[in-house]
């Protein structure tokens, strides 16, 4: 179990509300990452665990209950916590979403490095048996009206519902991630990125240099659509890669041509850390999503024979 040496204060905009958000990350002697909504009376602690991930209309990871105390878009912050090895903290927040900052994990990591970490490495969750979740299986579990809306949206956008996320045993002591995106937009097309993390300084430095700065992305027209419906109000060209309507370019400059899929590595790492530890295994994500990441963890933990837990 590891925590920060002292408290950290971070402020920024919520990507959906557009409002200023303040978080205070406090060191903790209890295992686990917990959020506390200081803007709500009797919020209590909200566990950042896979079994506390709630439903959301937005493409992010949300913990808690949407109708009550919840925190959304935690994945970039969780990825940064994972990378510095902190699995024990209480995060006080004065709103329903974490600050988007620059749309990546880099700014969180910079703040964490200023403070330092004390304690042991997080426990290892070793994948023993393969588990897989397919998008088609998820769709079957949704209400008919929701399925019809998604079917229509996918048909309009020319997307096939053939995505999956798979966890399988690894031959090494790493979390090996292979992420693949397939978009009809020419600027993205088909992109694959592979990354293996093994809790060493070299691996950490590689992440900071080659992945941490990758930003979230979306179409400019989609951005305007969301704003009209009270969402995406904090999105701007400083924190989101904005694709033009033709899909053959972006309104802001890319850091790497495959920045899109590199960002999916951040999302996957953040979601895997809701396991409560360092997942040792191979994670393959083909046209994956936050929902599939969460469901594959639920499937993993549904049977004790699927995994081992090793304390550091």
Where are these regions (language model features)?
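C-terminal regulatory domains involved in ligand/effector binding and gene-expression control
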Residues: 1-87, 92-312
């Amino acid at each position: 179990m590891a925590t920060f040496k002292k408290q950290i204060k971070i402020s920024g905009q919520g990507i959906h509300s557009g409002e200023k958000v303040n978080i205070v990350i406090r060191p903790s002697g209890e295992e686990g990452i917990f959020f506390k909504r200081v803007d709500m009376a009797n919020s209590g602690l909200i566990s950042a665990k896979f079994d506390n991930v709630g439903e959301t209309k937005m493409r992010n990871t949300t913990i808690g209950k949407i109708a009550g105390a919840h925190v959304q878009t935690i994945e970039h912050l969780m990825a940064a916590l994972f990378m510095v090895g902190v699995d024990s903290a209480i995060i006080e927040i004065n709103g329903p979403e974490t600050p988007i900052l620059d749309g990546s994990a880099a700014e969180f990591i910079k703040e964490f490095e200023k403070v330092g970490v004390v304690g042991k490495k997080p426990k290892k969750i070793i994948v023993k048996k393969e588990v897989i979740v397919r998008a088609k299986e998820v769709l079957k579990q949704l209400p008919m009206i929701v399925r019809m809306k998604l079917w229509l949206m996918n048909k309009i956008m020319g997307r096939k519902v053939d995505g999956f996320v798979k966890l399988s045993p690894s031959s090494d002591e790493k979390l090996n991630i292979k992420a693949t995106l397939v978009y009809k937009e020419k600027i993205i097309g088909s992109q694959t990125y592979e990354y293996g993390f093994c809790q060493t300084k070299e691996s950490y430095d590689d992440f900071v240099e080659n992945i941490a700065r990758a930003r979230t992305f979306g179409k400019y027209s989609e951005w305007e659509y969301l704003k009209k419906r009270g969402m995406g109000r904090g999105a701007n060209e400083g924190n989101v890669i904005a694709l033009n309507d033709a899909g053959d370019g972006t309104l802001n400059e890319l850091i790497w041509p495959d920045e899109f899929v590199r960002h999916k590595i951040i999302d996957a790492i953040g979601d895997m850390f809701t396991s409560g530890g360092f997942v040792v295994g191979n994670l393959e994500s083909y046209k994956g999503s936050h929902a599939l990441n969460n469901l594959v963890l639920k499937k993993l933990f549904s049977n004790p024979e699927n995994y081992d837990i090793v304390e550091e």
